Swiss-Prot record:
One of its GO terms (molecular function) is translation elongation factor activity. Pathway: Protein biosynthesis; polypeptide chain elongation. This is Elongation factor P. Involved in peptide bond synthesis. Stimulates efficient translation and peptide-bond synthesis on native or reconstituted 70S ribosomes in vitro. Probably functions indirectly by altering the affinity of the ribosome for aminoacyl-tRNA, thus increasing their reactivity as acceptors for peptidyl transferase. GO terms for cellular component: cytoplasm. Transmembrane segments: none annotated. It comes from the Bacteria. It is found in: Cytoplasm. The lineage of its organism: Bacteria, Bacillati, Bacillota, Bacilli, Bacillales. The gene is efp.
Length: 185
C-alpha cells in the first residue's frame, strides 16, 4: 500500500479493480475543508484516461509491473511477434493492444513489454526513435515564415509535421510520447 501523498508521475497503482499509471497529480489544500490529491490516471489494460480525486493520506495498492526486454520481430496478420532477447521465448500481441506504438515500431527494435502477474499489458517504447522519411514535399526556398512546417511520412507509415528543411531520405529523431519531431538523426 502507498499513500496518495507519495504519488509520482509514472507510478503504477491498483484502484477500482484496474491497473493505472499516474500521468499527472496535484496536491490541493483548500482554505476550508480537508486537503486532497487530484490525479489523472491511464488504465494500462484499456488505455483509457480518467481523472480521480483522493483524500489526502488515503492508501492505494501499488502494482508491481515487470518490464521484459524484448525485440520486435514481425507482423503476422493483426498479431505482432516479440522475442525475449535472453530466453528466445516469443509472444504475440494484437494490433488493438499496441495501436499507438505501431506508429514507431520497426523490425528488430528493442522495447520493454509490460507484464503484470503474467498478463501482458503493452509495449513501452524508448523516449525517442530514429526513423527515415519516405515521403515529403520539397521545401520551397523563400517559404521560411517563422516556425513553418510541412507533413512528412516515415518508414512505419506515421505522418508528422516537420520543419521545411527536412527532405526524403533524411533520418529523424521522433518523441514517442507525443509523436513530435525532435531533430534530424
Amino acid at each position: 500500500m502507498i499513500s496518495v501523498n507519495d504519488f509520482k508521475t509514472g507510478l503504477t497503482i491498483e484502484v477500482d479493480n484496474g491497473i493505472w499509471r499516474v500521468i499527472e497529480f496535484q496536491h490541493v489544500k483548500p482554505g476550508k475543508g480537508a486537503a486532497f490529491v487530484r490525479s489523472k490516471l491511464r488504465n494500462l489494460r484499456t488505455g483509457a484516461i480518467q481523472e480521480k480525486t483522493f483524500r489526502a493520506g488515503e492508501k492505494v495498492g501499488k502494482a508491481q509491473i515487470d518490464n521484459k526486454r524484448m525485440q520486435y520481430l514481425y507482423a503476422s496478420g493483426d498479431q505482432h511477434v516479440f522475442m525475449d532477447t535472453e530466453s528466445y521465448e516469443q509472444i504475440e500481441l494484437s494490433e488493438d493492444t499496441i495501436e499507438y506504438e505501431l506508429k514507431f515500431l520497426k523490425e528488430n527494435m528493442e522495447v520493454h513489454i509490460q507484464m503484470y502477474e503474467g498478463e501482458t499489458l503493452g509495449v513501452e517504447l524508448p523516449n525517442t526513435v530514429t526513423l527515415q522519411v519516405t515521403e515529403t514535399e520539397p521545401g520551397i526556398k523563400g517559404d521560411t515564415a517563422q516556425g513553418a512546417t510541412k507533413a512528412a511520412t516515415v518508414e512505419t507509415g506515421y505522418t508528422l509535421n516537420v520543419p521545411l528543411f527536412v527532405n526524403e531520405g533524411d533520418t529523424l529523431i521522433i518523441n514517442t510520447t507525443d509523436g513530435s519531431y525532435v531533430s534530424r538523426g
